[in-house]
Structures are given as C-alpha cells and as structure tokens.
Design a protein with these regions (language model features):
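Conserved alpha-helical scaffold segments that buttress catalytic/binding sites
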Residues: 2-135
Length: 135
C-alpha cells in the first residue's frame, strides 16, 4: 500500500487576503485577493454568502492547499472552507481537528456561520473524527 508520507511535498502557503493584515510570509506564497468579500464575510455571514465564497474559492484555491492564512481574527470561520475541501478527499472519521482559540467556537447560529459557530459545522463533516480545542 502506498504511504502518502513518502511523496509529501510541503505546499507554498496560501493567503486569503480579506483585509491586508497578513504580511508576506514565505517565498512562493499564493495570495488570493478577497477584499471585495470583506464586508459580506467579516465576523459572520448568511449561509448564502458563505456558499458563494466557498464556490469562488473552489475555483482559485490550489488543489494541494496546505497552510492557509486568513487575515485578522475576523475571518477565522472561513477555515471551514479549506477543511471541507480536505474532508472530501479523506475517508470517514480519519481527521482530528485541532483549534487553538480561547473560545470553543461551537455555538449554533441558525442564520448562517460566524466566528463563534464554525467549529460546530466542522464537527459535522464525515471525515472529522474529533475536534480538540486548546486555549
């Protein structure tokens, strides 16, 4: 059986640039300008707006997206988008998610998704076995 670690090559970091808060981090980084999404997505948004952003990013994120920076803490709920992409490639219950935050971010928010609710959505992904919150 093929061991995926044998062919592992780190991917250049991706910067989802909503607000210009992430300075250059590495040579070869891929910066995706998303300033036009800032107001619709900051802190939280409707499911419709989140789905629209997810569809947009599907067309611009590299297939082998590794480390992704998302700007200030106003946008960390966007973590769910690359996480969902990863989960589509993994078998069920094969991924542990580690969240470093001083809030659990697992609230239920019936009107969409926001910085305090994204972890509850992450936990529902079939590939996610456990979510560990440290902080």
């Amino acid at each position: 059986m093929h061991d995926p670690r044998e062919s592992f090559r780190p991917s250049p970091p991706v910067i989802l640039d909503f607000d210009g808060s992430v300075l250059p981090v590495a040579e070869g980084e891929r910066r995706i300008p998303l300033g036009s999404w800032q107001e619709a997505i900051r802190f939280g948004c409707t499911r419709r707006a989140f789905s629209a952003l997810e569809a947009h990013l599907e067309g611009v994120l590299p297939v082998d997206c590794g480390c992704a920076f998302m700007g200030s803490g106003d946008f960390h709920h966007v973590t769910l988008i690359p996480l969902r992409r990863l989960c589509r490639r993994l078998p069920p219950a094969s991924l542990d998610v580690v969240v470093f935050d001083n809030h659990p971010d697992n609230m239920r928010y019936p009107f969409g998704i926001h910085c305090g609710s994204w972890v509850s959505h992450a936990a529902l992904q079939p590939s996610v076995r456990r979510v560990h919150v440290i902080g």
